[in-house]
């Protein structure tokens, strides 16, 4: 009976597979949004202000960061929880695949969230004259929360690797 339960629990990891497929679809939608932004800006480029162009570029950077986060979560999550990816040639295999444990994924996700929050904050600050002081204050507080959380997670991870647990 115990072996049956263990096999069922072990096999249940495949329930995460549709989640990773969903993230792949989300990545496709994000890619479409990226190109939509580029197509939107091309005809208006000569009439745009410098700050308007910077805002568009920040949006593209934001989409890129979120896309990178999605790829990292999809690949490492699949490899950690479902099955190892068997890429035949070393040239095609990403260097970090198969090397990230759950803690390193958490730290990379946290630092990616901080980077994404930084881009959002910068976009907000570039339009500061149109934004209320309360919105700016909340943006800064939320960003600081992300920074402190990421720093705390990194410290805890470092301490656990040194044996302070």
From Swiss-Prot:
Membrane topology classification: Multi-pass membrane protein
Keyword ATP-binding: no
Cysteine disulfide links: none
Family from the record: Belongs to the UPF0114 family.
NCBIfam families, sorted: HI0507
Swiss-Prot/TrEMBL keywords: Cell membrane, Membrane, Plasmid, Transmembrane, Transmembrane helix
Species of origin: Buchnera aphidicola subsp. Baizongia pistaciae (strain Bp)
Residues in the signal sequence: none
Name of the protein in question: UPF0114 protein in repA1-repA2 intergenic region
Pfam families from the UniProt entry: UPF0114
UniProt GO cellular component terms: plasma membrane
Localisation: Cell membrane
Residues passing through the membrane, by range: 10-32, 53-75, 134-156
InterPro entries: UPF0114 (IPR005134), UPF0114_bac (IPR020761)
